Amino acid sequence: MLHRLFGLVKIHIETAGGSGEGEVVLPAVSKSAAVAIEAVIEDGKRRARMKEAPEVIMTGLPFVSMLPILEVEEREEVERQPKVETTFQMKTKELLLLATTSGGIGVILSGVFLFLMQFSEFIPVELIYGQVQTMLKTGIIVVATIVAVVFFIAWILSVAMTYISYYAFTVQKDEENIIITRGLLEKKKVTVPLTRVQGIEVIQNPFRQLIGYETVVLHSAGSVSGDGEKLNLFPLVRSKKREELLTSLFPTMAFPNPEHRLPKHSRPYFRRVHYNWLLPLIAALIYFFPPYGWLSVLLIPLHFAHSAWRHHSASFQVVDKQVILRHRGLLSLYTMYTTRRRVQSSTIRQSIFQERGNVGTLMLKIKSGSWQAEGRVPHMDIADARHIFYQTTPEKK
């Protein structure tokens, strides 16, 4: 915000192999200087491509006659401005929906907790503990009301933070880059070269999915956000428009829903993986909290339903040189779109029980900022897993 008051901007330049800290960081420069720096960088990229172009040897023409041609071509190349098209712009209604359904409340509460930990020696813990005991004696309704008020205030703060952060969110594209701008108090502009894009991940939250919205994340080589956060290509987009928008940005890729489902014999493995903690938890609740602990038995049918849901959601597909992997976490559905040559590592994991059922978990990792992003399909048929594995290993690229 201080930058905008004084007409200044902060420039963060990161290369593909950067660690996220930035090779060049200019804390405060004028807007005109920032535009000039951006123009110099783009001109350098164009000159680098001209040098990489194959050399053309022409015979039969005097050397002097070639000079005007070269001068005209160079002048046209420098003067030519890339055409920028606006692909996506978040509306106010979508921005409010994003703010109200975001998970920022967890960030607020964790920040308050860390703040209290830093100043714990100045906080009268015994006095607060005594007040809590007094409130517990007065009734659970008072305590529940206070907790609800605290969570409501934290939710209001998270809504405000998300709204300010993603205000005027716009995605543009020129011939070589994707340009993302957002922010109200602190306006940010991120430029991602198309050659550095490693994959696209679609995240479908069940609550947003009910009203037809989802989130699209862009994975790029090197840090591009400047502050270490993941880069949201479409923070909130209509599900029916997602494929059209992605195709306009990446015309060489396809973004269908994966068609190949998991076999029926892999369904029991989605249940077995959680038995090692679910059954001891139920036993402990029954032992320590009778008779209400018996209500925990209801977790068993809920677990069966959740496992069947995860099995039904998982799928995969290989489209030409692309790989599409889909799996469901605790609630959200994750779909990874990438190409074979972008895969950095492929892994198949098999337990003893999975070997008996001829199933395994396939995991593909791609570069994402300073780290890696993972696409996976759990408990898929081992033949299908090996087929994708051999196609994405370096020897097969």
Task: Please identify what each model-predicted range represents.
Residues 1-397:
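N-terminal basic, Ser/Thr-rich segments that initiate or prime the first beta/alpha elements at protein or domain
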